[in-house]
Amino acid sequence: LNAAERIGPAMLSIYPKQYRSLLSVRDTQVAIKAIKDWFEVSLAQELNLTRVSAPLFVRPETGLNGNLNGVERPVTFTVKGLGERQCEVVQSLAKWKRFALKKYSFHPGEGLYTDMNAVRRDEELDNLHSIYVDQWDWEAIIDRKDRNLWTLMGYVRKIYKALKQTERRLIQAFPVLETYLLDRISFITSQELEDAYPELTPRERENVHARKKGAICIMQIGGPLRSG
């Protein structure tokens, strides 16, 4: 059997034909760690976030495991010390973060972030998606009067600023790398995308507009479009 037959096509990494890594394998690992550290500091400062520890697994009856689209199966196991009661590896911290904001007595304008580790057994695998998730996850309390488009855009700009700050430090540490992010991020709604590119699929619209603008935030995702 060849590699594709042994592990299946979904497990293979796909590289552009002209791809060539600018860093050695070792420097790539150093850069990954540096990016994670620098972005953590910048994100916390920009959004006024406090780091908290998150669970790796929870009991099903707590209702704190995020169920994503509602069809993904969590990884489950029993714990001897709990009388063989069942636990689930977290798939999402969406519910837990809201619980934690209340538990730790956060106030409007404040928030938390955590180093989320999760296992998603039903994830569709490709270059960007893995069954193992390791990501910075955050949540903030927004006063009801501030829950509007301008607040959303403000948060996006702050996150993008943190990304730019991280990129700047990365290039200083590894001069062989080049600037990738534009100075500003642009905004567009999903309906505006459909109006601009009616002949394309939703994914194609995103790709075309991202290539055109360089850095985009798509808003109002999930609501019905005029096309139905």
Regions found by a protein language model. Name each.
Residues 5-228:
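Structured aminoacyl-transfer and RNA-binding surfaces used for tRNA recognition/handling
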